[in-house]
Amino acid sequence: MKLVRADDAAPEVLDRARAIYEDGFPPHLRASFENLLRDDLVVLVDDEPIGVAVLRPLAGTGWVFLRYFVAASRGRGAGTLLWEHVTRAMGEVGHVRMVYDVEDPAERGVEPDEVTIRKRRIGFYLRQGARLLPVREFVPPQGEVVQPMLLMAVDLGGGPTAPIVGADLRAVVEAVYEHRYGLVAGDPVVRRTLEVSGLA
């Protein structure tokens, strides 16, 4: 079993990776597959592809943003294997923290089945040692869609993830907004998140 970078993957591996990605996310949450190839797309291969992750370094921070993470099957351990391989690989190349956003199960108007899915997703990440960050009103630009998200993070040094608070938390919020979503610290959206999270 190994992680294969998109640049090194055979066409049939990329075709299967595309299928896993498109099956794993609804259309409103998907970027084009070609867009993913601008970042670091990796595929976990065990005879055939079983999971896909897309990552983007958060310039100059030592952190990496996990854009997408999806296993071909759920409930069979593929997600845990993918997580272990990705976090190990990111640590080996020098990243000290992985940050990502997840859909908020408390978002208004969400169907009960979707609430359950979102809670399970967060539960999976918590079991892997990640932390939900105490950030409120994190609203990354997603085209026409305005969707509040939650931020999570995991330290990649091998030990438990320490609480992320104060100036460290502010730096995470600003880095994600700037290097993932293109919003600088003075943007009203960023300022609002920092203010309501007690980080201004």
Locations of regions flagged by a protein language model:
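Short amphipathic alpha-helix that is part of the acyltransferase structural core
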Residues: 1-32, 172-179
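A conserved beta-strand-loop-helix scaffold within acyl/acetyltransferase catalytic domains
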Residues: 14, 22-73
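Conserved acetyl-CoA-binding loop-helix of GNAT-fold acetyltransferases
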Residues: 75-92
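A eukaryotic "domain-to-IDR transition" signal
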Residues: 76, 101-103, 131-136
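Conserved GNAT acetyl-CoA-binding A-motif
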Residues: 90-113
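C-terminal "cap" of GNAT-fold acetyltransferases
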Residues: 117, 131, 138-188, 195
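Conserved active-site tyrosine of GNAT-family acetyltransferases
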Residues: 125
